[in-house]
Amino acid sequence: MYPEELVIPMKEELTENGFKDLTTPEQVVEALGQKGTTLLVINSVCGCSAGAARPGVLYSLTGDKKPDHLVTAFAGFDTEAVAEARKHMAPFPPSSPSIALFKDGELVHMIERHHIEGHPAGAIAANLQAAYEEIC
């Protein structure tokens, strides 16, 4: 498990921008069971999370269409919450960072780590904005 002093600033990059921090399996079940659209970010300490995933997600939310609910859990820190979230992200294998869009509790769009690594934040944002246009 990562030390809290390392993780908190990375969590705050999302939570200070409207994301609810999910730290328990129960919170994950409740969040993903909501009506409407829910964006789930599995946050991480890795460089591709800092350089592409988090900035890309935040930039994606500047458009007209966006998800109804924004939630996040941190891999290697919120271990039980992330394990529960990954159950809802099947059949995709565990991946962090990763970004999932749910509609009425069903997974409808997924960005895995291999889609994030080596791609700029703008590409992540464009991918998500296209999904929002279609789904939200």
Regions found by a protein language model. Name each.
Residues 1-36, 136:
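N-terminal leader/targeting and pre-domain segments
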Residues 6, 10-13, 58-67:
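Short helix-loop-beta junction
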Residues 30-64:
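Local sequence-structure signature of Cys/Sec-based thiol-disulfide redox active-site neighborhoods
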Residues 51-55, 82-83, 121-122:
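Conserved strand-to-helix beginnings and helix N-cap segments that scaffold or border functional pockets
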Residues 65-84:
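Thiol-based oxidoreductase modules, predominantly thioredoxin-like and allied folds used
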Residues 82-96:
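Short acidic (Asp/Glu) patches
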Residues 93-136:
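Non-catalytic, surface beta->alpha helical segment in thiol-disulfide oxidoreductase systems
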